[in-house]
A protein has these predicted regions:
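C-terminal solvent-exposed extensions
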Residues: 42, 47-84, 90-92, 100, ...
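Solvent-exposed, acidic/flexible segments
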Residues: 87-93, 99, 107-111, 141, ...
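Extracytoplasmic/secreted envelope proteins and their assembly/folding machinery
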Residues: 114, 145, 149, 157-165, ...
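Structured segments of extracytoplasmic/periplasmic soluble domains
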Residues: 97, 103, 135, 162-173, ...
């Protein structure tokens, strides 16, 4: 009797192992199919040096900044900051670029309408996010000084990464680019986001049809207070700057990101699958599949910590001033040394 049970036990064990293997392989195949949706690109682009390449009518809405310090020539050339770049094996810094094509296709002539750096500490499982003001004046190879947002249009993600490394001495070798048009669709996939609106913001959104940026978009009628926004309205909110400044615009972008994260945390597996199918084809990165997988394996640890993102904007108050760049365009002059030190302290908790 024992001899009869033994083969049955072996068969059951083998069957379970085979079943687990099949499930694992299917799971890996599914996961890999999602990774295949992403556009992998090293971010390089031949630098364009034509003088009319930037968007001529682009404006910079910034709060009143002081004049340049007496020892700074506000109209002079911007010099690259000297010094070493600090590195920590436990910290991964990723440049996040939001490009504003207003179509479902990437355009190499797009500009980076949002520039952020997300810092992931895989030892402490903390997430930190900085927003970089788009109007910061930076040196551009083969050109005069210009806004940091235009570096993407001149030389792609590679040039923007290089500029961030050079100007802020920040260790960033990886980037993720997202088409803003697909962000709107992604927000719709997760059922919208809750955003608190001021009276001025509500009035602006209710008149958004006058704004060519929102032409043809499904902008809701909103009110002051908490609103549940669809994708188009959330993106219109994230773009607002006319009623106050570029600084507040950055805050709004981060507000939308946090609201979307909050919504995703409460989404079921079917919603997450639809979200991945909608957004991943319009994601471009130089992260490898192996690097993405390593970071994905850390996600449970990040979530278990229950930590919110620590956030800040660069440049900080008291470290910037009015400056002038290409063709007399107003720019933000920056004390790069001071901001580099601030970032080092923020990301690595060292002085």
């Amino acid at each position: 009797m024992k001899n009869r049970k033994k083969p049955i036990g072996i068969i059951i064990t083998i069957s379970i192992v085979l079943l687990l293997t099949i499930v694992t392989l299917l799971g890996w195949a599914y996961y890999n199919s999602k990774l295949d949706l992403i556009q992998y690109d090293d971010g390089s682009k031949e630098i364009d040096t034509s003088t009319s390449y930037a968007i001529d009518n682009d404006e910079l809405d910034i709060a009143d900044l002081p004049d340049a310090p007496e020892d700074v020539d506000a109209s002079g050339g911007i010099e690259i900051l000297e010094g070493d770049i600090y590195h920590d094996d436990n910290v991964v810094n990723i440049l996040l670029l939001g490009t504003d094509e207003r179509t479902d296709e990437f355009n190499e002539n797009a500009r980076a309408d949002a520039i952020m750096v997300m810092s992931l500490n895989t030892k402490e499982h903390t997430i930190k996010l900085i927003s970089i003001e788009r109007g910061i004046g930076v040196p551009v190879p083969g050109r005069n000084d210009d806004w940091i947002t235009h570096t993407f249009r001149y030389g792609g993600a590679a040039l923007t990464m290089q500029t961030v490394r050079d100007c802020f001495k920040l260790d960033v070798e990886r980037y993720v680019r997202v088409n803003f048009n697909v962000v709107s669709k992604a927000i719709d996939k997760i059922g919208g986001v809750d955003i608190e609106l001021t009276q001025a913001e509500a009035e602006h959104l209710n008149s958004a049809k006058k704004n060519y940026y929102e032409s043809g978009s499904d902008i809701q009628t909103v009110h002051a207070g908490t609103n549940h926004l669809n994708g188009d309205t959330a993106m219109a909110y994230a773009r607002i700057r006319k009623i106050d400044s570029d600084w507040k615009r950055i805050e709004r972008q981060r507000t939308v990101i946090q609201a979307a994260i909050n919504q995703v945390e409460n989404s079921d597996i079917f919603t997450l699958n639809a979200l991945a199918d909608a957004i991943l084809p319009m994601v471009q990165t130089n992260l490898t599949k192996a690097e993405i997988t390593r970071l994905m394996l850390e996600v449970p640890a990040f979530l278990s910590e229950g930590s919110k993102m620590e956030q800040m904007t660069i440049p900080t108050s008291g470290t910037c001033w009015n400056s002038v760049g290409v063709d007399g365009r107003k720019m933000i002059g920056v004390d790069f040394e001071a901001n580099a030190q601030i970032l080092k302290t923020f990301f690595y908790d060292i002085s």
